[in-house]
C-alpha cells in the first residue's frame, strides 16, 4: 500500500498518473458520488460532471477525470467517509455524532476567525488563527482515522491524500511519497513547507514551535497566495509550486512585528 500526498494542482497530475499506474486499485480522496463511474464510462461528458459536482477546482477536476479515463482498466474507488458523513448530515440531518460535533466546532471557529478581520486587531486575529488551526488539526486526525478504518481491508492499493493528512500513512503502516518533493527534486531544490502546513503539523504532533509566529506568517502567506488555478505553459513548468515556494522563502524571513506591519498594509481600509 502506498499513500501519495498531493494537492489539486494540474502540474501534479503527471506524477499522480505515474504513481497510479503502478497499482491495480486506485483510491481517491473524495466522497462517493453517483456520477463518478458514469463519467469514467463515457455515459456523461466531463464538462457535465464538473458542473454537477460544483468543484472548487474545475480545471483540475476536468484534467483528473481525463487522466483517470486512461487508467480505466484499474479499479478506481472514492473513499472519504468523513466527508460522506458531512453530506449525510446536511441532506438528512442524521449521521455520525463525532462528525456533527467536529463540524460544528470547526465551523464556529472559522466564522470567529473571519469576523475578527472586522476589528483589524492583528494579535486577536493571530489568536483566532491558532484556535481554528488546532481544531482543524483535530478534524484532520479524525478524517484520517475514519479513512484508514475504511481502507483497512485493502492490501495492494495506491491512495491519494491531501498534503496535511500526514498521519494517514502512519496509521495504515504504508509507504508514502509527496509530489511537491518530487517536483523539488526535478528542479534541483528542496521542498519547503508553508507556515500553514507547519502550524497544523505542530498541533498534530504536539511539537514545541513558535505557534504565534507561524500563525502570523501564515496570515501573510495566505494574503499573497494566488487563488486562481494555473496551468503549466510548457513541459517542466510548475507554476503553483514555483509561486508558493517563493512565498514561503519570503515569509520565513519575517518576524512577528514585520508580519504585523505587512498585514495592516494589506488589510487596512484605503
Swiss-Prot record:
Tree of life domain: Archaea
Protein's UniProt name: Uncharacterized protein AF_0701
Amino acid at each position: 500500500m502506498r499513500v501519495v500526498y498531493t494537492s489539486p494542482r494540474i502540474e501534479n497530475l503527471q506524477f499522480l498518473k505515474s504513481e497510479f499506474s503502478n497499482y491495480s486499485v486506485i483510491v481517491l480522496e473524495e466522497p462517493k458520488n453517483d456520477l463518478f463511474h458514469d463519467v469514467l464510462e463515457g455515459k456523461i461528458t466531463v464538462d457535465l460532471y464538473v458542473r454537477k459536482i460544483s468543484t472548487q477546482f474545475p480545471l483540475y477536476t476536468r484534467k483528473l477525470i481525463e487522466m483517470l479515463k486512461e487508467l480505466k482498466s484499474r479499479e478506481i474507488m472514492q473513499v472519504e467517509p468523513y466527508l460522506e458523513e458531512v453530506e449525510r448530515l446536511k441532506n438528512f440531518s442524521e449521521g455520525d455524532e463525532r462528525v456533527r460535533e467536529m463540524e460544528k466546532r470547526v465551523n464556529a471557529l472559522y466564522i470567529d476567525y473571519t469576523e475578527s478581520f472586522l476589528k483589524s486587531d492583528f494579535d486577536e486575529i493571530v489568536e483566532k488563527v491558532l484556535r481554528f488551526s488546532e481544531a482543524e488539526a483535530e478534524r484532520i486526525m479524525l478524517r484520517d482515522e475514519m479513512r484508514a478504518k475504511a481502507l483497512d481491508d485493502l492490501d495492494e492499493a495506491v491512495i491519494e491524500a491531501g498534503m496535511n493528512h500526514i498521519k494517514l500513512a502512519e496509521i495504515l503502516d504504508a509507504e508514502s511519497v509527496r509530489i511537491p518533493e518530487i517536483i523539488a527534486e526535478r528542479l534541483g531544490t528542496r521542498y519547503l513547507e508553508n507556515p500553514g502546513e507547519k502550524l497544523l503539523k505542530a498541533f498534530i504532533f504536539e511539537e514545541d514551535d513558535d505557534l504565534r509566529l507561524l500563525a502570523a506568517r501564515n496570515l501573510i502567506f495566505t494574503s499573497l497566495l494566488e487563488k486562481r488555478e494555473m496551468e503549466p505553459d510548457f513541459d517542466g513548468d510548475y507554476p503553483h509550486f514555483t509561486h508558493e515556494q517563493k512565498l514561503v522563502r519570503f515569509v520565513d524571513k519575517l518576524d512577528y512585528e514585520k508580519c504585523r506591519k505587512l498585514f495592516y498594509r494589506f488589510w487596512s481600509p484605503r
